[in-house]
Amino acid sequence: WMKKHPLTDEYSRFGSFDMLAENNREQLKGLIAEIAGQENEKGTVAQKIADIYNLAMDSAKLNTEGIEPIKADLERIASVKDKAEIGPLMAELSHIGIRPYFTFFVDADIMDSKSNLFQLYQGGISLGEKEYYLDTDEATTDIRNKYKEHIVKMFRLAGFDESAARKNMEAVLEIETRIAKASFSAVEQRNPAANYHKMTLDELKKSVPGIDWDAFLSGVGVKGVTELSVSQVEPIKEVEKIINTIPVEKQVAYMQWKLINRAASYLSDEFVAQNFDFYGKTLSGRKENQPRWKR
């Protein structure tokens, strides 16, 4: 396999499923490029596909715009002045793919496959595994230090001065480290029974009263929830403590970081390059970023 499929610089690994994904992407590229290169009737699915593909491929436009595509969202987050506003903002951000603190979804109830269940799941950290925040060996410490500098550089690209960028980085690390300490490890997440805590909405409100769950569910657009599963209770309770005890300005910095981090690969070449330098090279071991059409 290794002789027939030498590892290219854009991959840190390449197995049979990677090959399937690569072949699938090539076929999709051909289909989309054909649609994007022709005139399409306004309002059709083809027109929408062409518009979003051509926009994503227009690096000159993205480089000119810089931080502009997410500037209004950064300002919206910065407008939060009270902890009571954080829950509704979390729900609001979910509509643009940003889920700070924890994630959520609707999926089959693992104890009753005929029913779907709203589920809360741990999240909120940007390094994937809790050990990156907590282990003290040389390799992990080096990654953590590079992550800190990466956060600073990204805030600088977003228009923050050096002092503000470093202050924001400290806030991000404080919050993410607290979430990491309470989170389940990858091994612990493999135990289905330990990651299933079905309860009524009223029970959730009593267990985690520091979050306005009615406002949150209404904000994300979910109605009629009477039962749900809290996959990992401890990190959700830790988030409750964070929201109610950490100064709002630190939480603003954290949520702004989640936005910048999530949007980085869709912004200008400077953001893309810095994002790849850390997540691609440092964290994943890749030597070269993928071409724009793959990203």
What are these regions (language model features)?
Residues W1-R295:
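Zn2+-dependent metallopeptidase catalytic domains
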